[in-house]
Amino acid sequence: YQEDNFSRYYAASIVRGREHDPFVAKGGSAEETRDTKKMEDKASKLKDFTVAEARPLPVIVMADVSGSMTVDGKIEALNLALKDMVAGFAAESRLRAEIQVGLITFGGERARVHLPLAPAHKISEVSPLRADGRTPMGAAFEEARKLIEDKDMIPSRAYRPVLVLVSDGLPTDDWEQPLDGLCKSERGQKATRFAMAIGADADVEMLRRFANDPESPVFKAHEARDIHRFFRAVTMSVTSRSRSTAPNSSAPLVLADIPEDDDLDLDF
């Protein structure tokens, strides 16, 4: 009698448990229910480990290619420095930030986009710069402003851009209003802005108005090797940001850590 009552009680408990199992109520077994829940738990955990897409970190260089850059190997040193910088960026990990590079040149009568903004690891070659003519720097500022404010080229999720200005002379066009327009634009005022004055004829005061990092004042290049050292420092600053847990924080130029190149020893 006791055994019979226990059997009936146990059977009733099982039935009640099955009635409250939504999967079993629809015709599935308890074992199938457990397997389904395990699969759902695994899928949920996989979602937690999904790797986020790297955010763009734009680097835009404005390079002087006026006629004076042909003197003393300046343009050759600049070409080599840009090539090495892009290669350095391309070798970086893209887990958090994807470094992108664009190049605007100004020389002759106009400024133009020499290298459209693109991920560094997808840039197969930077065609050599050729120097000639005047120094339309104001036009370069306007090109840079249009580029950094273009939400199709640089999406809202991008990290703050880096702007680099390199010149060996005085602007030959109207430049003050375009410079203010660039530096006061929504993204321009948040950007990290580095500047290099090449030789004794560069407009250092104008370059100071462009540069905005108190820890990285206008760098003065007195010889060809200095151009290379400056761009190595830019490379280190940007890659440091890309590896950081906070890539929107600027990293100053540290030229003390950059070795001098004995094969680039032309004085300007």
Question: At which residue positions do the language-model features occur?
Answer:
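Acidic, polar low-complexity linker/tail segments
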Residues: G17, F23-I60, V65-E76, E149-S156
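Von Willebrand factor
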Residues: A52-H114, K122-Y159, V162-V166, D173-D174, T192-E205, ...
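Short glycine-/polar-rich loops that comprise or flank the Walker A/P-loop
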Residues: L57, Q189-T192, D213-S216
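Arginine/glycine-rich "motif VI" loop of SF2 helicases in the C-terminal RecA-like domain
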Residues: S93-R94, C183-A191
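Short beta-strand-loop
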Residues: A97-S127, V204-N212
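Extended acidic, low-complexity intrinsically disordered regions
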Residues: G199, A224, A246-F268
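Von Willebrand factor A/integrin I-like adhesion domains
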Residues: A200-S249
